[in-house]
Amino acid sequence: IVPGKNCTACGACVQKCPKSCISMKEDENGFLFPQVDTDECIGCGLCDRVCHLNINMRNDETKMAFACTHSSDDVLKVVYGCAYVTPTEPHHIRVARKEDLKKLRGSKYVQSEIGNSYQQVLNDLKFRKWVLFTGTPCQVAGLKAFLGKPYDTLVTADIVCHGVPSAAYFRKYIEGYEKKHGCTVRSFDFRSKENNCGTYAGICNIDNNNRTLTRKIFYFNEYYYFYFLKSELFRDSCYDCHYTNLFRPGDFTLGDFWGIDGKKLGFNSVDGCSLVLLNTDKAKKIFKELNVCSSKVELAFAVANNAQLRESSRHTDFRKTLLREYRECSAEEIQSCFKRRYCIARIKARIKYAVPRKVKKILLKYRHLTK
């Protein structure tokens, strides 16, 4: 098994082990790592051979980039993706009904547990079912390593990923939020379209005194959200990611299309615009059959406006302080330190958020014209 900091917790080794002697355990900072029961291990080496970091996943096929908005209800037969199974625990789940696809929507700025999804995918593929698997690049790479060979009926889509904090860190934050507000969190969406599109504002649905309430979550008010955007909370492997480039493991790459405001696309992007990279011939063929509003853009433009297509996220020495706070402090204490530490930055963020979106679009358009 790949040691320590390089491990991405994709879980392929856990599902491949013929003796089921590998399990995922949290370390002192809440990150998941594989742990081997040496008494049960037979030394077969499958865990090493299935690790995507030990396999060349480089995809050299010619890429195409598109700006897109969704305009179709067409779906594949089975979809795998990340969903909250509790308000603090995102897991990969299998979806076979159209009405359940909504569970996979929304941004989840926390690492999901794969569980036995790879084995479920294999079972579906054996029955010749069409499968769409979505996840972070390392999860897609983990699936492909687990399968060991390509399948005609498998379609994969990796996301433009900044990095993943631990579920334990997120769980601690939610527990602190519940204690502070005297409520029970029912759902959490970091980037809700109920707020202004393109803003870092989420939605938290809570139960409070027998009432169900909806509260906006602003990154400048919450330590977890703020530190995520500063790239200080991720697992070690995220800062040396193998997939922050154009050699993607997925057939498709999906993400927000930053920097697209001011571009003439030929369709209305007021509700947001997605970046879609077509990484394989399979993706290009499927894309032609989809009912989406799209506009082809230069690949170089997409890369220039999405940093994680060029380089891994970076952290500062401050990350050590945040991990120490996680180990030693309560959520209330971490929140209090955050507010004192970033008082001025939070005021500036509030002012920036108060500027109407229409004004921002005019300024962005002017910036493009003056370049």
List the model feature ranges, each with a label.
Residues 5-19, 39-54, 136-142, 233-246:
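Local cysteine-cluster metal-coordination motifs and their immediate loop/turn environment
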Residues 1, 6, 12-29, 33, ...:
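Iron-sulfur cluster-binding cysteine motifs and their immediate structural context
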Residues 178, 183-371:
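Long, compositionally biased charged/polar accessory segments in the mid-to-C-terminal portions
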Residues 38-124, 302-324, 329-333:
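Flanking helices and flexible, charged tails adjoining ferredoxin-like Fe-S electron-transfer domains
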Residues 12-34, 202-223:
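Short, charged low-complexity linear segments at domain edges
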Residues 1-4, 36-39, 220-229:
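Short, intrinsically disordered, charge-biased short linear motifs at domain edges
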Residues 73, 86-88, 133-143, 163:
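Gly/Ser/Thr-rich loops at beta-strand to alpha-helix junctions
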Residues 152-176:
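Short, flexible loop segments at boundaries between secondary-structure elements
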